[in-house]
């Protein structure tokens, strides 16, 4: 492959100026920790605008974006159909605080697509969805203990900040100050892909476990897929012990297939949490599942949960039009093809340039680690060469490729990415890996 990358200066002076001021105004200068580039060094670039597969910073640098707003931008940033629909919705108002027909329309699409969902409740974030799902599994079973997996991230609620992934993993935090022991005393943990560890917990607490929650494909400790039989084994164990199985598909829902991991792998949980894609880039979350479970949620039932902006017309509009684009023929075949081209290309170039690297992909989602692997859980992910990743990230950034600024985050492709974008990315990767 002959490099055709243009020579470009990489001036980020305006970004540095803005970030310096931001640090005086906001903790760490950001509204979410991973954006601060703490694990890769240097100051973050400050975006000015996005469109399609690209982002531009305030200094005018253009990037091929493989973060996609951390997952929502699966049809590409600022898709014209979504933007036009939002313009029309804005003219009717930004929030009603009352029932809205758009809630019905998005709910019908979610229920049609996701096998486990017979009823759905909209909220405002993935964190909120997971908080409600946890409360619901406890309310339905009358039990308190919950099993989660090391490196899986379910938002920043107190009860989930135990061996969590995402920004917690990025910063190397074992948990978080300010979380009382009582909040996590009923949270049990096991290594991801370790069915025997889960069996042992059920044997120890056979009548006390309300359920198991997990990212069925991990994206918040890097990209880690389930081993054959793992999801099926969890389904069998939860049914055996009368516990609920909850798939956190905030990241994977409508991404690796229209029906998420559960549709692609054929393992159906009792409850599912969603977010990101279903809001088309606007703040949103949802949880849903079997009718008999969901009817416990107020006002139909006794389990209380509410939200001022839940089901707001802008998020519903963006979600409806995003899902309608995703339903078109060939969508996921294209995502699989473009993601395979990128992920396999990276591994091949790493091998050719003498670097240990392992990784994988599913449609629209990929990841890699600077280690020989295999990586089947968070402990194995931590074997990655983080200093090498940081240098690789910086080199790619300077060449116009925007990757997640953490080894412990998955990457995302979109319908807007082209084969030419991927080839350009691989050319940049070859240049950088030759220098490491």
From Swiss-Prot:
One of its GO terms (biological process) is protoporphyrinogen IX biosynthetic process. Its EC number is 5.4.3.8. Its main location: cytoplasm. The modification N6-(pyridoxal phosphate)lysine is found at residue 276. The keyword GTP-binding does not apply. It catalyses: (S)-4-amino-5-oxopentanoate = 5-aminolevulinate. It is found in: Cytoplasm. GO terms for cellular component: cytoplasm. Its cofactor is pyridoxal 5'-phosphate. InterPro entries: 4pyrrol_synth_GluAld_NH2Trfase (IPR004639), Aminotrans_3 (IPR005814), Aminotrans_3_PPA_site (IPR049704), PyrdxlP-dep_Trfase (IPR015424), PyrdxlP-dep_Trfase_major (IPR015421), PyrdxlP-dep_Trfase_small (IPR015422). Coiled coil: none annotated. Keywords: Chlorophyll biosynthesis, Cytoplasm, Isomerase, Porphyrin biosynthesis, Pyridoxal phosphate. One of its GO terms (molecular function) is transaminase activity. Pathway: Porphyrin-containing compound metabolism; protoporphyrin-IX biosynthesis; 5-aminolevulinate from L-glutamyl-tRNA(Glu): step 2/2; Porphyrin-containing compound metabolism; chlorophyll biosynthesis. Pfam families: Aminotran_3. Homodimer. HAMAP family: HemL_aminotrans_3. This is Glutamate-1-semialdehyde 2,1-aminomutase.
């Amino acid at each position: 492959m002959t490099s055709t990358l243009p020579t470009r200066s990489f001036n980020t002076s305006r970004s540095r100026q803005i970030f310096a001021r931001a640090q005086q105004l906001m903790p760490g200068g950001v509204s979410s920790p991973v954006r601060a580039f703490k694990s890769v060094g240097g100051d973050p670039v400050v975006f000015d605008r996005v469109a399609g597969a690209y982002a531009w910073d305030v200094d005018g640098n253009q990037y091929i974006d493989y973060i996609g707003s951390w997952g929502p931008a699966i049809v590409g940033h600022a898709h014209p159909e979504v933007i036009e629909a939002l313009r029309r919705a804005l003219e009717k108002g930004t929030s009603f605080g009352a029932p809205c027909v758009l809630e019905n329309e998005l709910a019908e699409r979610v229920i049609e697509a996701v096998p486990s969902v017979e009823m759905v409740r909209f909220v405002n974030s993935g964190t909120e969805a997971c908080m409600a799902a946890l409360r619901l599994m406890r309310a339905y079973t009358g039990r308190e203990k919950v099993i989660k997996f090391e490196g899986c991230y379910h938002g920043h609620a107190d009860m989930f900040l135990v061996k969590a992934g995402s920004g917690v993993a990025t910063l190397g935090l074992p948990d978080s100050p300010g979380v009382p022991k009582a909040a996590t005393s009923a949270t049990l943990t096991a290594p991801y892909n370790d069915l025997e560890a889960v069996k042992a917990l059920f044997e120890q607490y056979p009548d006390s476990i309300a359920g198991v929650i997990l990212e069925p494909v991990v994206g918040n400790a890097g990209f880690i897929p389930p081993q054959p039989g793992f999801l099926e084994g969890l389904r069998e164990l939860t049914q055996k012990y009368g516990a609920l199985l909850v798939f956190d598909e905030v990241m994977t829902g409508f991404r690796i297939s229209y029906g998420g991991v559960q549709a692609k792998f054929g393992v159906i949980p009792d409850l599912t949490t969603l977010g990101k894609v279903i809001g088309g880039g606007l703040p949103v979350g949802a949880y849903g599942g079997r009718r008999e479970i969901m009817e416990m949620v107020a006002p139909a039932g006794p389990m209380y949960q509410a939200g001022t902006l839940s089901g707001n017309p802008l998020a519903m509009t963006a979600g409806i039009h995003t899902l309608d684009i995703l339903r078109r023929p060939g969508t996921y075949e294209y995502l699989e093809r473009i993601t395979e081209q990128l992920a396999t290309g990276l591994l091949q170039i790493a091998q050719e340039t003498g670097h240990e690297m392992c990784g994988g992909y599913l449609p629209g989602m990929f990841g890699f680690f600077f280690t020989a692997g295999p990586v089947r859980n968070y402990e194995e992910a931590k074997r990655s060469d983080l200093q090498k990743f940081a240098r690789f990230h910086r080199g790619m950034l300077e060449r116009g490729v925007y990757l997640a600024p953490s080894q412990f985050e998955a990457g995302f492709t979109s319908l807007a990415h082209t084969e030419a974008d991927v080839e350009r990315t691989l050319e940049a990767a070859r240049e950088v890996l030759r220098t490491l």
